[in-house]
Amino acid sequence: MSGAETTALGAIAGATIFLGLPLGRVQQLSPRVRNFLAALSAGILLFIFWDVTGAAAEMIENALLGAEDGGSWGRFLVFAVMGAGGLALGALSLAWLERAMLRHRPLPPMSGGSVDAPPAAMMGVDPAAVADQARRAALALGMLIAIGIGVHNFSEGLAIGVASKSGEIALAGTLIIGFALHNATEGFGIVGPLQGTRPTWRWLILAGVIGGGPTFLGTMVGYRVSSEPLELAFLAVAAGAILFVIGELWAGAVRRAGRNLVLSGIIGGFLLGFATDLILVYAGA
């Protein structure tokens, strides 16, 4: 398979993330359904986190086994530090980015107020400003999810490119199909937590490019450069970023909907992600 063909198929695999994004424009959903979708998003991300950390841990364990068999202990130490450091970097980077995205001026005061006024007005602030702040927070969280998924998808693109370059055409094709299915569910993961906030088409396109575009970029890099340390670095950073987002989704969903609904959604999302992975394994068998 040529580099151009591999890159084109990698782009298709990444573009399937757009299949789930239009759900964010649907407004005729009850609060309970929206909270369930947010929990479903957390479940999908939880599976991705499990999948990513498993792949990264396998690389580190193989380096350890190699060192025990007379290989380099330095390689193992480098891999271990990269794994731990990448995890921390991914989580802390998104925490910093969230603060930067939500940096805002104090809410403007509102004169007057009455018993019948909205809670925000009774507290002396402009309800419109409160609503705008909530909208910005929801869109920021959705974009953070897209960023975390994008880092993860870059590592998936690397796997596609490496398999194609090494002549394993069947494996490369299977990876493309499997990752395309994964990306389709990840689109739901991005818009699920928006909670009634209707994003613009421009926002959805940007989120799709950030979340799915790295699959295309990773495919190009993987076809030209085969580097296990590079793959480990992106897996670790992706794991940290996704872990941060899961924490944000869990805290918000439990506060709004309660534990039972949230746990049901998380289990459903995890099983959905696992099902797509089983399809990938079966197709490659």
What is the role of each PLM region?
Residues 1-285:
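Intrinsically disordered, metal-sensing/regulatory segments
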